[in-house]
Every structure is written in C-alpha cells, then in structure tokens.
A protein has these predicted regions:
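Short glycine-rich or small-residue beta-strand-to-loop segments that form or flank ligand, phosphate
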Residues: 130-135, 184-190, 310-318, 354, ...
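Short, solvent-exposed amphipathic alpha-helical segments in soluble enzyme
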Residues: 146-151, 175-179, 200-203, 237, ...
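Active-site phosphate/pyrophosphate-binding segments
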Residues: 209-392, 444, 491-500, 504-530
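C-terminal accessory domains/tails appended to large, multi-domain proteins
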Residues: 430, 443-446, 453-479, 484, ...
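Phosphate/oxyanion-binding active-site loops and adjacent basic polyanion-contact surfaces
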Residues: 104-115, 166, 195-199, 360-363
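Glycine-rich phosphate-binding loops that contact phosphosugars or nucleotide phosphates
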Residues: 117-286, 498-501
Length: 530
C-alpha cells in the first residue's frame, strides 16, 4: 500500500457505529442464540475448531459478510499477507507471516541459515549448557511458551527466562549456572529496552566476576538495530537481525526463537513455522463461513460489542500450555486494547476484552465457579489435545472428560426445576429443597469455543498461535482500530524514565506530578541506594 492509497483509505474510513451494516449485524447478533443441538466444527491446518457454543443464525452470517465487505476484508487481508502497510500509525508492514513461509526471500533465508548454523555448532561442541534468555513482552512470551512445551529434547541444556526489571528475577535466573558455559541471549527490537539492557549489564558483571576475560563473547543479540548492539559490545557474528515490520508480539517467528532452537531443537522451530504457514494458507483461502480465524473473530465481536462480555477466558487443558495464557493475553490486549479508530476518532462500541485464564483442571478449582454462576460470566476458549504424550490413558481420559463437561455445563446450564428435582431425589425435605435449588441454578447459554489439537506437536502449536493472530487482525479490522501499535505501553515507559531520574536524585521532582505520585517520589527518593 503506497502513501496515496493509505491517504485514500483514511479519507474513506467510516466509524463502525455509523455503518448501516453494523446496525444490521447488531440486530442479527442479538437474535442469534446458542443452539445446543447444532454442531459447527471447522477444520483448519490440522486443528478442529468447534464454534457450536457461539450464537448463530443465517441472518448473522449474512450480516457478518456484509460487514467484512464494507471493511474491505479481502483487500486488507491481501495487504497483510503481501507486506503492505497495515500498521498505519507507524507507517509499517506487519509481515511476520513471511518469516514462516516455506520459501521466504533471500534476507530471511540468510538469517534462518545463520541461526541454524549457530545451533548446530553449539550442539556439536556440546557448548552452552545453560541459556539465560533476556527479553520482555513479545521477546519473551512466545519463546518461553515453546521451550516449556517442548524443552524435553535437550536434557543436557537448561534455559531460564528473565524479563522483569525486578532484580530478584535476574538473581534467580543466574543462580546455579556455570558462567563459563552460559550463553546470554538478549532479545530487544530497539536494543534500548530498559529491562533488557539493565539485566544484560548484570549478566556481564556476573561473567566478569567469574574471571571471564571477554564476557561479550557469551552474549548473543537479536535486534532490529545491529549497530546499537555492536556498539554495546556484542560481536557482529553474534548479532541476529530483526526487521521493523516484525511487531514485538510476533517476534517468535524471527531469530528471537534462537533459545527455542538451543533448548529444544531446530526441528521445533521448523515445525511451528510449518503449522503457522498452514494456518496462513487456510486464512487466505478458506471461504468466510469456513474460515476459522474469521469465525472466531466474528464471535468475539458479538460477545464483546453486542452481548457486552468484558473478558475472555483461555482454558488450555494441557499443563504444557500454561504459558499460552499470557501469550494470548499480550497478543489480544496489546493489539485490541484501543479506543481510537483509524481516523483518530473514538470507537463508540466496546473493543478488546480483558484476557485471563489458567490450565484446566486447576482452573476448575479457582475461578470456574464465577464462570458458571457469577453475575457477569465470560466466553471461554477451551483448548485440548486429542492424544497425550505421557502414556497414562486414564489420566488423559479424565482430563478430556473434565474439559467436555465444563463446556457442556456452560452451554446447557441447570434450570431451577432440574435443581429442585436433584435435591428431592437426594431425599431432601421439600422446603429445604425449594430453597437450596435456587443456589444450584446455572444460567447456561454462556459462549465458548473448543479447539482440539491432534496432540501437542510444534506444528499444532504453530497453527494455534497463527489462528489467534489472524482472529485478532480481523477483529481490529471490523472495529476500525490498528492492532499493530502499542502507544499505551510507550507512554508509561517515558514517565518511568523521568521518575527513575527523580528517585536517583539526578533531577528535581516534577511539580506536575499528581499528589499521590509526588508523595511517593518524596518517600522513595534514594531507596535504590539503601
């Protein structure tokens, strides 16, 4: 997309609430209840995406098509996949899909080959028994997810992740490691991220304290600013390239995944890329009614902007996917947590929900009470594998049963009459049964998806992550917001820099602080020196 077409797009932009297609969509969504007798399962890149637990009607499907058409879905999707400028506030492409293409361009291929050779050499020399991965946000969550899901492949090599500026995190990240056989992987797109650089400095001190003469030889950098990393001291041969068109929350597909290759295997990276590429193809080619990311996005719009659900629960019924929750949390909330539309006006409908969750069955004993009987409730994405890898059939059978049962309970609910009958059948006196039955009522009709993976393979995980990426893109398109920037993150970082200088006594306290901030700056000044 050139600057002329970008200008044209902005000039022709219409806020969502002004579109007659949106009014028709709202009416159809409000009159499209969940039907427990209807089955809707979509096949996408080897995943089964069961959207039977969402409201549906032919009228809603037709209204969704009209809404996507007025938003020029097919053209904007092509721009995304072809490297056009879709991140309009920063004037960039969001071409992370090119990083997982089977036959990428020469520059991407070169970085892939460099990454592969680095891992091959480290493996052949049995070097770097400990990896400390330093990065935050998108430079951390995706790699952490992959390593914790598949990290069993390298029993002789350990990976630890440090993201937080809290020094306790860095102390724990280095504890017990041999500095002489530890590689520090620093991932930062700009190579100016405070948390990453400060933790990197601590790592250098730790290496020097162990008597290592050239500590920078133990550092690898992944960044879009190789010049800055080299100036910091990282040898050029150990700097891997990012591109400015790779957003942080999509950087898993880039050289940031070096730690995945070292801790797991390069086959894990290749498998995830292949699965994601298969989902890209599905997203590009499948009809709207059969397109899993599109249909999940439409349901998400209905649940948030029409039905008013303020949050989305992620419930992976696989312990290895514990880190999937914060990964999706960042992807959805950093992408869709916006209230300004593309033209600079305010979006007059609710946008991105709060995303939260934890693996089942732990979740059932933590917050499922709220999901079933709370006054608000939330849509739930259940994610589970058909086959397990532990070999304990009974454990997996019970896990699957719990996943299916929780979803069915949310869908079907329990009426007062059924609850009363249950109490009476248990031999309860009539008056007590009539009273207690009210406490056992489950509203039901609460939306959910069930995403079934064949098993937790790199291919399936890659497809799953791309499914959510494209879902988020479509939701941003419909709402008319840019899902590829994060100005809300930047604002706080600027304020933190100033306050840090005030706490250190380097500058006077800003008289423009609110009363509470001014009080705590005064109270905490000099704390870091004590």
């Amino acid at each position: 997309m050139n600057s002329d077409s970008l200008t044209s797009q902005l000039e022709n932009f219409q806020p969502l609430h002004t579109l007659p297609q949106w009014a028709a969509f709202e009416r159809a969504a409000a009159n499209s209840p969940i039907h427990t007798g209807r089955l809707r399962v979509l096949s996408a890149a080897g995943l089964d995406v069961d959207i039977s637990g969402q409201g549906y009607s032919p009228e809603l499907a037709q209204a969704a098509r009209a809404l996507l058409e007025v938003r020029k879905f097919e053209a904007v999707r092509a721009q995304l996949l072809d490297g056009g400028i879709v991140n309009i506030t920063e004037g960039r492409a969001a071409w992370h899909t090119s990083l997982r293409e089977p036959d990428p361009d020469e520059e991407v291929t070169t970085e892939r080959q460099r990454l592969t050779e680095f891992v091959r050499q480290a493996d052949s020399e049995r070097r770097w028994r400990s990896i400390v991965h330093i990065g935050i946000g998108g430079s951390d969550w995706g790699v952490r997810l992959a390593v914790n899901a598949f990290g069993y492949a390298r029993a002789w090599r350990t990976a630890h992740f440090v993201a937080n500026i809290d020094g306790h995190a860095m102390q724990g990240g280095l504890a017990g490691f041999d500095p002489h056989d530890t590689l520090i992987v620093m991932a930062s797109k700009s190579f100016t991220t405070t948390e990453t650089l400060k933790n990197g400095e601590r790592a250098l001190e730790w290496l020097r304290a162990a008597g290592i003469q050239n500590p920078h030889d133990h550092i690898v950098a992944i960044t879009a600013r190789p010049d800055v990393a080299e100036k910091w001291g990282v040898p050029s041969a150990q700097v891997f390239k990012l591109w400015d068109w790779v957003g942080g929350r999509f950087s898993l597909w880039s050289a940031v995944s070096l730690t995945t290759g070292l801790a797991c295997d390069m086959d894990v990276i290749a498998g995830m890329q292949a699965g994601a590429a298969a989902m890209d193809a599905h997203f590009a080619q499948a009809d709207i009614d059969d397109n899993a990311p599109v249909q999940m996005a439409i349901s998400g719009i209905v649940n948030r902007s029409v039905l008013g659900y303020g949050s989305l629960n992620i419930a992976p019924y696989d312990f290895r996917l514990a880190d999937l929750v914060p990964y999706i949390q960042q992807l959805e909330m950093e992408s869709l947590g916006k209230s300004a539309n593309l033209a600079g006006g305010r979006v007059e409908v609710p946008t991105g929900p709060a995303v939260w969750g934890m693996p089942g069955t732990d979740a059932q004993h933590t917050f499922f009470q709220w999901l079933h009987q709370g006054s608000d409730g939330a849509p739930v994405d259940f994610i589970v594998c058909r086959h397990a890898d532990h070999g304990w059939a009974e454990h997996h059978r019970i896990l699957l049963a719990n996943c299916l049962a929780q979803r069915e309970a949310l869908l079907k609910g329990k009426s007062y009459d059924n609850a009363l009958r249950e109490c009476l059948d248990a031999g309860m006196p009539q008056d007590r049964a009539q009273w207690l039955a009210h406490h056992k009522v489950h509203a039901g009709g609460r939306p959910s998806n069930l995403i079934m993976l064949p098993r937790l393979s790199p291919y399936a995980l890659g497809a799953l992550l791309a499914l959510y990426e494209h879902k988020v893109f479509v939701q941003g398109l419909i709402w008319g917001i840019n899902p590829f920037d994060q100005w809300g993150v930047e604002f706080g970082k600027v304020l933190a820099t100033g306050i840090a200088n005030e706490l250190a006594g380097a500058v006077p306290a800003d008289p423009g602080h609110d009363a509470s901030t001014a009080y705590w700056v005064q109270q905490l000044a000099g704390t870091a020196q004590r």
